[in-house]
Curated annotation (Swiss-Prot):
Range of residues in the leader sequence: none
Tissue distribution of the protein: Expressed by the venom gland.
Keywords carried by this UniProt record: Antibiotic, Antimicrobial, Cytolysis, Hemolysis, Secreted, Toxin
Gene Ontology CC: extracellular region
Protein name per UniProt: M-oxotoxin-Ot2a
Pfam families (UniProt xref): Antimicrobial_3
Taxonomy of the source species: Eukaryota, Metazoa, Ecdysozoa, Arthropoda, Chelicerata
Amino acid sequence: GKFSVFGKILRSIAKVFKGVGKVRKQFKTASDLDKNQ
């Protein structure tokens, strides 16, 4: 029981980190494009 809850928490944290990574990548690309213009 406890372990499945822990797994769920870890999975949701991993999801958040993935989402943040994606957003940061897009943001960096956008700022790079901004510099080039």
